[in-house]
A protein has these predicted regions:
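Extended amphipathic alpha-helical interaction segments
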Residues: 108-203
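Prokaryotic Sec-type signal peptides and long signal-anchor helices
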Residues: 17-21, 44-47, 208, 217
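Leu/Val/Ala/Ile-rich N-terminal alpha-helices, chiefly Sec-type signal peptides and the beginnings
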Residues: 28-111
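Sec-dependent bacterial lipoprotein signal peptides
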Residues: 1-26
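Residue-level detector of alpha-helical secondary structure
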Residues: 45, 71, 78, 85, ...
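Amphipathic alpha-helical coiled-coil segments and their boundaries
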Residues: 59, 63-66, 70-73, 96, ...
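A cross-kingdom marker for long, charged
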Residues: 194-238
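Short, structured coil/loop segments at alpha-helix boundaries
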Residues: 17, 28, 56, 60-71, ...
Length: 238
């Protein structure tokens, strides 16, 4: 019986000891919080906010340790940055496929390529929307001290909100251009032998058909100019 009591007290003592250790560790971590917060704020102010780049750097092991729990807050920015880079790369690939479409005849003969590229862009947009929803949810649940929140909010606007707006615009314009190219290809195909192809141009015998073709082509070129303007903005942030 004494042996059982001894074992019981040992278990109780061990439990109390471990509980005390946990509280000590928690207290120690809490004592580091001001220092960790200060380090994180300084990092955001010196490495993120002044940078012209859209992407954000990956934290080193030392930085993660110095930021403590705030390394998880930074993950919101870095996770989105990683997804954004992948999305832009995917959109560029879709547009590269379109570079093989260099003539009116190509828009007829390569409609499958155009349609495939458009579906890829649609998939990228769907993933972008899901990613942004997840990021916004994580961001809304943050509980940060006021001094950190003021700086982090600026970093969030710069590295998430603004890039997301540019990516959304890029994908929408790309989809519109691909849709217009597909529409032109279908239109030319519907005319059959009423249209002749000479080099990169299409020749019509009916003025109304030519006018409609030019109208469609002009609308597509306007969208291409809009996409080029967005691309220039992005080029300055690479």
């Amino acid at each position: 019986m004494a042996w059982l009591q001894s074992r019981t007290w040992k278990r109780v003592f061990f439990t109390l000891f471990m509980t005390g250790m946990v509280w000590q560790l928690a207290a120690c971590d809490n004592n580091k919080e001001p220092e960790q917060r200060k380090a994180f704020i300084q990092f955001l102010q010196t490495r993120i906010l002044p940078s012209e780049k859209l992407s954000v750097p990956t934290l080193t092991a030392q930085e993660k340790e110095s930021f403590g729990k705030y390394a998880d807050d930074y993950a919101i920015l870095s996770d989105y940055s990683s997804e954004m880079t992948t999305a832009f790369s995917g959109n560029d690939q879709a547009m590269r496929q379109m570079r093989s479409v260099t003539s009116a005849k190509d828009m007829v003969e390569k409609r499958d390529t155009i349609e495939k590229s458009r579906k890829e862009v649609g998939n990228i947009e769907s993933k972008r929307a899901d990613t942004m929803k997840s990021v916004e949810d994580r961001y809304s649940k943050l509980k940060q001290p006021d001094d950190l929140k003021a700086v982090f909010d600026q970093a969030y606007q710069k590295t998430v909100v603004r890039p997301n707006a540019l990516l959304t615009q890029t994908l929408a314009l790309t989809d519109a251009i691909l849709g217009q190219a597909l529409d032109i290809g279908n239109y030319l195909n519907s005319l059959g032998n009423k249209v002749q192809y000479v080099g990169s141009m299409a020749q019509f015998t009916d003025q109304k058909q030519l006018d409609l073709f030019n109208e469609k082509l002009s609308a597509m070129r306007e969208k291409q100019q809009e996409l080029l303007a967005v691309a220039r903005q992005l080029a300055g942030m690479q």
